[in-house]
């Protein structure tokens, strides 16, 4: 229920401040929403598919600060994440302290970035909430640290402040190596929304297809390397039924096609009306779509696609509000109904892919104050491959 309440409130704020352009209380409401999202994620209890894996790591695989070794500080072990866990563990903290720190860090920077680049902040936050919020705060906590830091590295690259940009990328990589992809951003800074970029997006599908063919044998080789952790993990990605299901046309139509098609059509139609803030972000928007398309054939690319998805959400927020405002000759209710009909497939797709399809991982919501054990959720997550789970010990959490 708490998820629906937040979504409903965000929709009301979208109408009041983005569509009807009220100003009174705008900053205060933005801050209240930020605090609410921090607390919901920070005070959760065993909510999210990977939360119990993080819990296991914290209590059974985290040394005290004085016991950290050189191996703990290697890039592959996400040293800044290890240091954070060790610090909290050393001072006698519980794991939900880590959750609050991560949630505050990630959401504050996301909200700051949205406010910096998007005119319609509540609409963008709504899209963030239904598409990336649960992912960043429960499933990929380590990577989320790196991603939000590297978003600001992209801004420095636009200003040609390379030293600051790559310093932030180094910090991001120390949280999770996957964000190394941001280091290659300068190669794509000349991209613009035009016919060439549309052709590039079409080409990215065939690039993904070629990678899928060439990487298939490599994944089989990794699978045969029984002692190799990376091999085991990649092999499990390939054999996990949910990932196999993602490769089918049915799931691609539900999960991926709407955001790709809506983004291309809406932004291309409104490209001459984009604000200067958005025009600066064109390269990242196109990169995000390209990775999204490549993930249709190479599912592990969804990790990179999620790193750039915030740019797609910023552009979508602008185009949706702009299209609705263009209907002012119509009655307000008629204009809103038209927008609802036009964009409901997109919203439903985002909701289905995050909060509906795997709802057993997140619903019902439980907090550290009640600490309820949801048997259905526990059975589900304990049967997930490639994850070790700790027992549901209320006192330990």
Regions found by a protein language model. Give the residues of each.
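Membrane-water interface signatures at transmembrane helix termini and the short loops
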Residues: 138-150, 154, 175, 264-324
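Short hydrophobic/aromatic helix or loop-helix immediately within or flanking a transmembrane segment
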Residues: 52-63, 71-93
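Transmembrane helical bundles and short interhelical boundary loops of multi-pass, membrane-embedded
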Residues: 284, 337-397
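Membrane-interface transmembrane helices that cradle and orient dolichyl/undecaprenyl
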Residues: 150-164
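Transmembrane-helix signature of polytopic, membrane-embedded enzymes
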Residues: 24-25, 111-131
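Membrane-interface alpha helices of multi-pass inner-membrane proteins
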Residues: 133, 164-188, 289-293
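Loop-to-helix entry region of an early transmembrane alpha helix in multi-pass inner-membrane enzymes
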Residues: 79, 91-108
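Alpha-helical transmembrane segments and terminal signal-anchor/GPI-anchor hydrophobic tails
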Residues: 47, 52-56, 64-68, 186, ...
């Amino acid at each position: 229920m708490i998820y629906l309440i937040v979504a409903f409130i965000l929709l009301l704020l979208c109408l009041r401040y983005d569509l009807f352009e009220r100003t009174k209380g705008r900053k205060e409401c933005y801050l209240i929403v930020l605090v609410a999202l921090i607390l919901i994620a920070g005070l959760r209890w065993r909510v999210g598919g990977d939360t119990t894996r993080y819990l296991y790591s914290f209590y059974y695989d985290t040394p005290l600060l004085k016991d950290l070794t050189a191996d703990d500080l290697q890039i592959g072990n996400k040293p800044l994440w290890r240091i954070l866990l060790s610090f909290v563990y050393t001072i006698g903290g519980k794991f939900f302290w880590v959750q609050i720190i991560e949630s505050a860090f990630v959401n504050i920077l996301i909200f700051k970035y949205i406010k910096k680049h998007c005119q319609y902040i509540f609409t963008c936050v709504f899209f963030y909430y239904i598409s990336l919020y649960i992912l960043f705060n429960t499933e990929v906590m380590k990577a989320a640290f790196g991603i939000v830091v590297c978003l600001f590295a992209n801004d420095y690259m636009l200003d040609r402040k390379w030293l600051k940009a790559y310093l932030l990328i180094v910090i991001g990589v120390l949280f999770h190596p996957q964000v190394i992809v941001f280091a290659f951003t300068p190669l794509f800074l000349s991209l613009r929304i035009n016919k060439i970029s549309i052709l590039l997006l079409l080409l990215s599908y065939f690039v993904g297809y070629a990678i899928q063919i060439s990487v298939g044998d490599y994944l089989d080789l990794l699978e045969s390397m029984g002692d190799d952790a990376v091999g085991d993990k990649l092999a499990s990605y390939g054999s996990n039924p949910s990932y196999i299901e993602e490769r089918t046309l049915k799931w691609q139509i539900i999960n991926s096609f709407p955001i790709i098609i809506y983004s291309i059509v809406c932004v291309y139609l409104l490209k001459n009306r984009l604000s200067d803030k958005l025009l600066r972000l064109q390269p990242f928007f196109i990169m995000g779509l390209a990775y999204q398309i490549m993930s249709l054939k190479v599912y592990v690319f969804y990790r990179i696609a999620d790193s750039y998805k915030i740019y797609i959400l910023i552009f979508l927020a602008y185009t949706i509000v702009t299209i609705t405002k263009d209907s002012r000759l119509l009655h307000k209710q008629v204009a809103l109904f038209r927008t609802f009909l036009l964009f409901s497939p997109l919203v439903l797709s985002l909701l289905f892919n995050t909060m509906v399809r795997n709802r057993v991982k997140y619903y019902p919501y439980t907090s550290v104050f009640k600490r309820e054990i949801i048997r259905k959720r526990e059975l589900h997550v304990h049967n997930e491959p490639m994850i070790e789970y700790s027992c549901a010990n209320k006192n330990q959490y």
